[in-house]
Design a protein with these regions (language model features):
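Short, compact, well-ordered microdomains
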Residues: 20-23, 31
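Nucleic-acid nuclease catalytic cores
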Residues: 28-58
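Active-site-adjacent loop/helix micro-motif of nuclease/hydrolase catalytic cores
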Residues: 11-21
Length: 105
């Protein structure tokens, strides 16, 4: 099973306030039940979509809870999870979902 939410960002800094605590809690429980949870983030100014694995979201979330940044920067993201542009497909996340599955093994 797959659980995701779509978000939009107009700068290179994504505020974690755009994600609600209940969403993080739900995704955490979903992953514990062997589901795949992630965010799809549209960085509109770059015309790019990014697949943010729950494990990365959780890392940024916990950093904020521990008193650190309440956001993350584009530069902190793994470029391997930028969605490739494909003709005729607006949000081609399936290839990156396959990479996520492979990286978990």
């Amino acid at each position: 099973p797959v659980c995701f939410d779509a978000k939009e960002c107009h700068t290179d800094t994504f505020p974690l306030a755009n994600v609600h605590p209940h969403q993080v809690a739900f995704m955490e429980q979903f992953e514990k039940q062997e589901g795949i949870a992630f965010l799809l983030i549209s960085f509109t100014h770059r015309e790019e979509f990014y697949y943010l694995r729950f494990s990365d979201l959780e890392k940024f979330w916990n950093r904020a809870l521990d008193g650190g940044r309440k956001s993350f920067r584009y530069e902190e993201l793994n470029p391997e999870y930028i969605l490739p542009k494909k003709h005729g497909i607006l949000v081609p996340y399936l290839d990156v979902l396959q990479k996520d599955l492979a990286d978990r093994e």
